[in-house]
Every structure is written in structure tokens, then in C-alpha cells.
Swiss-Prot record:
InterPro entries: CheB-like (IPR008248), CheB_C (IPR035909), CheY-like_superfamily (IPR011006), Sig_transdc_resp-reg_Me-estase (IPR000673), Sig_transdc_resp-reg_receiver (IPR001789). It comes from the Bacteria. Contains a C-terminal catalytic domain, and an N-terminal region which modulates catalytic activity. GO terms for molecular function: phosphorelay response regulator activity; protein-glutamate methylesterase activity; protein-glutamine glutaminase activity. NCBIfam families: PRK00742.1 (NF001965), PRK12555.1 (NF009206). The active site is at S159, H186, D279. Its main location: cytoplasm. Belongs to the CheB family. This is Protein-glutamate methylesterase/protein-glutamine glutaminase 3. Keywords: Chemotaxis, Cytoplasm, Hydrolase, Phosphoprotein. It is found in: Cytoplasm.
Amino acid sequence: MRIGIVNDMPLAVEALRRALAFEPQHQIVWVASNGAEAVTQCAADTPDVVLMDLLMPVMDGVEATRRIMAESPCAIVIVTVDIEQNVHRVFEAMGYGALDAVNTPALGIGNPQTAAAPLLRKIQNVGWLIGQRDNRGKVQVVPPKAGGARQRLVAIGASAGGPASLAVLLKQLPASFNAAVVLVQHVDEVFAAGMAEWLASESKLPVRLARDGEPPIPGQILLAGTNNHIRLLRNGSLVYTAEPRSFVYRPSIDVFFESVANYWRGDAVGVLLTGMGRDGAQGLKQMRERGFLTIAQDQASCAVYGMPKAAAAIDAAVQILSLEKIAPRLAEVFD
């Protein structure tokens, strides 16, 4: 992987250099000391991934992320000291297209390889996304059991740019919206609770983390909240699971959409929002093949037109809509 580093602290840059040295396939192509330099460097030599600090002089990491994704788009991972204290900035950067966030590896404390492991896992996940590898076996579609009340479900998947897009979509849903909503956003479990709280502040409907073993609940929005996949079981409950292990990025949108296609008994809509790579495209296609309405976000309103593009390419979406039109469409379907 060709990697650019954006950080104004020499010790942090050195910590990143040492961490990356554990994986010889990674190459540092440039180092920028502020966001403005990073924008210029990306335009001249776009790397595979940028490791972006948040708090810097001249231009901070949020604005630099916005500029890079608009001018020279590439994978961006936020790497900063104490990300838990900068959650809102992290979400803002993710809204502009950053994929993930992780603490800067500690320098000179404990085992250096152990300290580097979280960052290296994030980079590995990014490699999976931008490489668009598909290591799955064929998923067997099992028809749902007959009978039971017709319940309503909206299954939404998002990645890079997702937090801001989800906020826009959820804000437009009326307080009377009576379908269950389950969100799968590519976000580390460290940020999941904070993201649920933030989305709740933007929504007329309650938003919280999904609990293992509970069913989707009408009028509530549940967010996948761990680093495992979330699936719908035959009995209608949600479960967190490490399987399938072939999916490097967790939680996987495909895993959830496919489980909805297999087991949901009522009416459902699948929605695939902005994101890098192709996660969710095959699952959305399975939902369409089961007769569910499927929607992909259009290119013009996406921060990163990757996952919806992959869905459009395989004819997985019944409708391709701008972000502003998705919530009104959901309200119309479930009126």
C-alpha cells in the first residue's frame, strides 16, 4: 500500500513510521505537516491511503478530508491522539468521506508490535475495500417461513460519507414513521455508541445500538454496534456473529442484507448509501431478487460513489435516488 501521512507532530510521524515498518508491503510516499500540504500532495501523487491527523495548523484534518475527497479522492483513515475526545470531529470527517479512525500508536510504551496492531488492521481493511476483493462462497437463499403478520423493515448500509448522509436521511423521517430501521455503518465499535447518540440528536425517532437477540422494532432505529457482523435470524431476531470470517470489514452490509433477503417475513426496503468499495451491492441484489424494493444513492449526492455504483452496475437497485429523496420515498412506501 502506498501511504501518505498528515501530522504536524514529529513524534507522531515517527510512531507511524515504526508501526508501518512491521508490514514491509507498505510504502510511505510522502509526509505533510498540515491539511493544506496534504491537499497539494494528494493532487500531485494520490496514495492508496492517507493517515490523517485531526488537529493541525493552517488546515485541520476535517477540512483536508473534505478537500481531498472533492479534488483527489482516496481512502482516508483518521489517526490522532485520543480519538474518544474528538468523536464529533471524527464523525464530521467521516461525513466527508473518511473511512475509519484509530488512535496514534504509542511510542516507547509496551510492546511496539502490539501498539501498531490496531492501525495495521485498519489499513488491512482499507486494502480489502479498495481492492474490492470478494472472498465469499455462494450464499444459499432459504425461503422465509410462511405466515405471520406483515411487518415493515428498512435496512440501510453506509460506509465512507455515511454519518452525514444518515443524519440527513433520518432527520427527514417523520415521528410517525412506523417501520423498523436497522443501520449498518462501517464504523469501529469504539465510536458506535457516540454515533447512535449523535444520530438520535438529528432524528425525530429514537436511535440506539442494536442488542444481541432482539428483533427490529417498529418506530425505532437500531445501529449495528460491534466489530462483528449483524444478521437477521429465521425467528426474526438480530444476532451479532463473527461468521463469515472471510469478510474482512465488519460489520458487513452484504451479510445483513443477505440475511434480510433470506429470512424477513414482511415488507422491506434496502437502502445503500455512500461508501468505498462494493460492500452491500450483492446483498441489495438478493433483496431485489426476493421482491423487496431496493434503493441506491445517486452519484451526485454521494461523498464516495463506490458501493452504490457497484449496486447500479449489477442492477441491484430498483431506484437510484438523490439523498434528499430517499426519506420521502420511504415515508411514501410505508404510509
